[in-house]
Amino acid sequence: MPTTAAFLRALYILTTLRGIGTSHEVRNIKHGSESSASRARFLLHTLVIIAAKYLVLDMMTFQPPSPEDTDRMFGEGKEYLLFRPDGLPPPKMQDILTNLGVTLLGWGPIGSWFIEVHYRILSVASVGLGISQPHQWPPLFGSITEAHTLRRFWANFWHQLFRWPMQGLSSFLCRDVLRLPRPSLAERYLKITLVFAISSCLHLAIDGRAGIMLPRSGALRCFLLQPVGIILEDGAQALYRRLRGDAPLSKWTRAVGYIWTWAFLSLVAPMYNFPLFRYQDPARNGVPVPVLRPAMEYFRVKG
């Protein structure tokens, strides 16, 4: 391989966090129409998606809640539906619905679209400039219908941008430093815990840039509880298989899985999101460049 080609190949491996098109490609990536699309078709298709999702995000966030509404819905301790701080009354139905709504939107389409739009903008720039090819930009997120367990939420639906480096570091610590037997339950669950611990530190650093430091940030609480949910889930699934065997999952079993997944996330996700609503500048919760507000003001002046 010529020196220039080898250098570009090495550079690509260093910059493709998901290992796209390499032997290290992370699992569960769905390759869609971009695999066979021409550059022009890919750019047009991606630009349409960016525009549509950007406008929806702008519409959902251009009118932030007032300080009074923020305190009423996301006030100190409101993120806890269980084990509430002393002085807070038991959660009401409105609290439960707020937690569920924030989770379904923030960890469903709205949260994923915020990340996806940036990813697609980068793909347009890279493919448009000839730096990469369309097939190197598969969808960042999977289908939300895959998330009928916590494992599948993180492995099949949510983005895998940092899975490769995080798993590499956790595997090194478990196998080479701690020398845990492989396979074993200790190695399996410590690896998962370390991955979420690294993720929590990354989110804590992001919060810090927004001025939300410990103990205000809920990153550690939210992400370090994910392995607990996965362990409980694995135990329940093992018991189910022992009782029912390896029969294919029925639609009712999947329905129970969806309820479990989103119920658990509704208990822990607000631990991360509510402090952002409380302490972060509301302008940071919207799109980088608002479109709807200036348009409405323009037509209001014209009217």
Swiss-Prot record:
Signal peptide: 1-23
Keywords: Acyltransferase, Membrane, Signal, Transferase, Transmembrane, Transmembrane helix
Subcellular location(s) of the protein: Membrane
Gene Ontology annotations of biological process type: lipid metabolic process
Keyword presence, Acyltransferase: yes
EC number: 2.3.1.-
Pathway: Mycotoxin biosynthesis
The keyword Transferase appears for this protein: yes
Cellular component GO terms, alphabetical: membrane
Chief subcellular location: membrane
MF-aspect GO terms: O-acyltransferase activity
Transmembrane segments: 42-62, 194-214, 257-277
Family, per entry: Belongs to the wax synthase family.
Role this protein plays: Acetyltransferase; part of the gene cluster that mediates the biosynthesis of acetylaranotin, a member of the epipolythiodioxopiperazine (ETP) class of toxins characterized by a disulfide-bridged cyclic dipeptide. The first step of acetylaranotin biosynthesis is performed by the NRPS ataP which produces diketopiperazine cyclo-L-Phe-L-Phe via the condensation of 2 phenylalanines (L-Phe). The ataC domain of ataTC then catalyzes the formation of bishydroxylation of cyclo-L-Phe-L-Phe.
Identification of the protein by name: Acetyltransferase ataH
Source organism (scientific name): Aspergillus terreus (strain NIH 2624 / FGSC A1156)
Lineage: Eukaryota, Fungi, Dikarya, Ascomycota, Pezizomycotina
